[in-house]
Amino acid sequence: LPDGTIYIQKRSDSMLLDPKLGHIHFGFMQFVYENKQWFIDLANQIDDNRKDPITFFGEWCGPGIQKGVGISQIDVKRFFIFAIQIQGESPTWLDFSNIPYKRPNERIWFINMFGKYTLNANFNDAVTLLQQLDAITLAVENECPVAKEFGVSGIGEGVVWSGRDSDGMYIQFKHKGTKHQKPKGPRSSNPDVKIENPNIQKFIDTYFEKYNIYYL
């Protein structure tokens, strides 16, 4: 918040930063408390005259959190930021790849530090789109590029995609590999699906799972 107050949140709950509850969320509360000034400094750098809250979206990863993936084998837990939003009447998503933050933190990383994938998604052609997503996700599932940066070889869970539709609306979803999927509907690389009235959100809700995020 503009006054420096910090809340941590995941999909199921939200709470005020409290070091007495440092053990919750696999130690995420304690981690944020220890790095509180880092987040405040970054928020001030983004907008030191802000009147609205800033939210940092990210994945809390490391030993004891995820199971069976490469990122769970890195030496310590880390927070990987993949989106930043300024709240308010008209929320703004920031291009955080251009934030010239000069105070590095070994346990906080921006996801763009590990490269990215680009795709011109045609939601009118579900079959082709799923095939394109599957090909990229398969490569990540076979070898997690983030874990590899930390000297660990192991499988990846999936890819978080973000972008804008033809109307300029921001969209984001996670496409998981076959080893991590819990299908909500018909799912294969060649699904028999017809979209007469394309609806991106319905498409995502049908074929993809929501990503697990922690944000503050």
Labelled PLM ranges:
Residues 1-216:
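Core nucleotide-handling region used for phosphoryl-transfer chemistry
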